[in-house]
Regions:
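Terminal helix-turn-helix DNA-binding modules in bacterial transcription factors
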Residues: 4, 8-25, 44-80, 107-126
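Append "Primarily bacterial transcriptional regulators
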Residues: 25-34, 38, 42, 76-83, ...
Length: 282
């Protein structure tokens, strides 16, 4: 329950700062996790990216401000963080379907998006297999791409990198270098601590590879969930981990990378494991 309470405290912080700057790192601190893990949890639990939720809340309040008085559009835009009237107009129309200049007209309808409240709902769903393992640090080698701090901006970047290395032969080269546990092609999101965020496509290997990068995955305790199926099934498993397992598990996110292990990378029926770093709650 503490985990859910912290998420709701983070929502309270967002509400207090809708007319100011919202610090994603502070959200992570309130929720006792990295800003990356907070954004992932929020997206799965709320059904929308964090940035979209914030935009909807701001535009909901902006409509109230414009309807209820003589506030100038430029002042309301500035209040909610838009330095450009054009950007504000675009955001307002995307939510309400009308221009902000027409909001005071008789009979005009706007949308209201109230604040989210998280709670635990127990329902009868399928079982989840997992194991808890504590592992020493291990070396991976491969290629990486930088990630944005707003994770939805990376949705096209990561698949593009997988496609690139599949075509240019790098993926097959990595598979041949693989000689240590965990055995499989790894997708590693290093979005923890103060380091720059990166996504690695790599293998656990003792070998050196010309033109390849290396990263040391820190020692950590991992909750490991096996699965099989398409890429969509991986996303569904990750959603269930965050929304069903984590809130009642007695664990919370640790400050370490997220890992996907592709044991058999058949795009139609892959065998994989999802590793999330955990510590005992409290």
């Amino acid at each position: 329950m503490e985990w859910i309470e912290r998420l709701n405290e983070a929502i309270g912080y967002i509400e207090e700062n809708l007319a100011g700057e919202i610090d994603y790192e502070q959200l992570g601190r309130i929720a006792c996790c990295s800003s990356y893990h907070f954004q992932r949890m929020f997206s799965y639990m709320a059904g929308m990216p964090l940035s979209e939720y914030i935009r909807r809340r701001r535009m909901s309040l902006a409509a109230v401000d414009l309807q209820g008085g003589d506030a100038k559009i430029s002042d309301v835009a500035a209040k909610y963080g838009y330095s450009s009237p054009t950007a504000f107009n675009r955001a307002f129309q995307s939510i309400h379907g009308i221009a902000p200049s027409t909001v005071r007209a008789e009979g005009v309808s706007v949308k209201s998006f109230p604040p989210i409240t998280f709670r635990i709902i127990v329902k009868g769903v399928g079982e989840m297999n997992y194991r808890i393992e504590t592992k020493e640090a291990f070396r991976i080698t491969g290629v990486s791409v930088p990630l944005e701090k707003e994770i939805e901006k990376n949705f096209a970047v990561i698949p593009s990198k997988w496609q690139e290395i599949s075509v240019n032969g790098t993926l097959q080269r990595l598979i041949q270098m693989m000689d240590r546990e965990p055995m499989g092609v790894l997708g590693v999101s290093t979005c923890n601590g103060e380091e720059a965020w990166r996504y690695y496509i790599a293998v656990s290997s003792s070998k050196e590879g010309e033109g390849l990068e290396e990263y040391i995955v820190p020692a950590a305790t991992w909750a490991i969930f096996p699965g099989e199926g398409t890429n969509e099934s991986i996303q569904e498993l990750e959603r269930r981990i965050v929304t069903e397992w984590l809130p009642t598990s007695g664990y919370e996110y640790a400050d370490a990378p997220d890992i996907e292990v592709y044991i058999s990378p058949d795009p139609q029926n892959a065998k994989y494991e999802v590793w999330i770093p955990v510590v005992k709650a409290g």
